UniProtKB/Swiss-Prot annotation:
Sequence ranges on the Lumenal membrane side: 34-48, 152-173
Cytoplasmic topological segments: 1-12, 70-130, 195-437
Disulfide links within the chain: none
Cellular compartments annotated: Endoplasmic reticulum membrane
Cellular component aspect of the GO annotation: endoplasmic reticulum membrane
Main location: endoplasmic reticulum
Name of the molecule in the record: Palmitoyltransferase PFA4
HAMAP family: DHHC_PAT_PFA4
Catalytic reactions on record: L-cysteinyl-[protein] + hexadecanoyl-CoA = S-hexadecanoyl-L-cysteinyl-[protein] + CoA
Highest classification ranks of the organism: Eukaryota, Fungi, Dikarya, Ascomycota, Pezizomycotina
Amino acid sequence: MAGLNDVPFIKGLAVPSVCALIIFLGYASQFLFNYSTTLEPGPPTRRETIIFNGLLLVLWITYYRTVATDPGRYIFKDRVIEAEGQRWCNKCAAPKPPRAHHCRHCARCVPRMDHHCPWTRNCVSMTTFPHFLRFLIYTNMSLWMLGYFLWQRFSKIWEHRRLPAYLGPSFYGLICLSLISIVNFVTTVALGIMLINTVKSWVFNQTMIEGWEQERHEALMDKGPKEWWDIMGPDGEKVRFERLEFPYDIGFFSNMAQAMGTHNVLLWFFPFAGNPTVAKDGNGQGWTWEENGFNRIEGLWPPPDPDKLRRAARGWPAGNRNYAEELRQANMSSSEYKAGFLKRQADDEKRKRHLMAELEEVDDFDMYDDEEYDRELDQGLGWVNSDGDRLRDYGVDEEASEPEGVNDDDDDDDDDDVPLAELIRRRKILKKDGLDD
């Protein structure tokens, strides 16, 4: 499901496709039941029709609210250049509160991001989760009722299976009934699984992303220190790895009430009920989250990612740029720049020929293990869980995140690793703030 977010064709047709599916299963089926004179036991009763269409109406309302509700955004009162001791988003150039992740589709940090749903073209987040849950509940109820109608008609066909064919349903009526049944069965199974996973997330107060993080953390702890013994932090000290408990499971009822934004159980399933919103003052709902106190201190989640820490230790490639040389080239004339480019190109060709000559001297060069290469390439894309999902598959922009401590300004020499454009941006902000004062 998550990979569908990257298919442009599906992204554009996702919502219209869902609407077409609702129309086909909800209304084409009723047309068949009411106007096919050969299908027993005949049209649904008045009571059944009212209940079924009532469920369809609620389904439309909850789906619209799931699609149209803003997934939430963080608004900072003051301009922030750096945030010591907090997670930092490189794309938003702002601190990243707990449980927030930068969605590569919504292009923002989303509060309590669960995943980016391709069928709603929206993030399932702190603000949209109640509508998403209600949509799944009423959709499954509608599918179950439609399944009951279909079972009634197929049971009659089976009951009269020994009668002559002309006494049974028409050929086209049987084809339509079978097609609706197949689509209904597939949709019921898919959305039933989705409902189970969503209710599990609701009860345990754990998003899909946090479940992925916990599975990765447990796998890392099971492997032992051999997986992280070589990892050093930005301060040159070894990073401390310890087994962490998921901190946001604060109790059955509290988990559910927090996700729905109210302790009133009746409003949890009311289609017109509201949703939680992000506090405007930079503190409170959406900014801070209650923890269960099972870990030695608060704020340890998410657990450190060894892969990100290793990448941070290697440094950003732009940090190795020769800014003095770039400034010198900026003052060159077009002819001088072209001559320099041609010289570098010739040097590259010379190095390439030298490398190929060395490779030709290796006797077993053609015996390179392609499968091993594929495994290394796959591992380079990041850790995958038991379902084969990476963090990117949930819509998270991993490039927007940095390991904790990467942005700490413990030493004046840290500016040497900051890109030139970032230093210029900070200087402009400081100058502007000075003029405002």
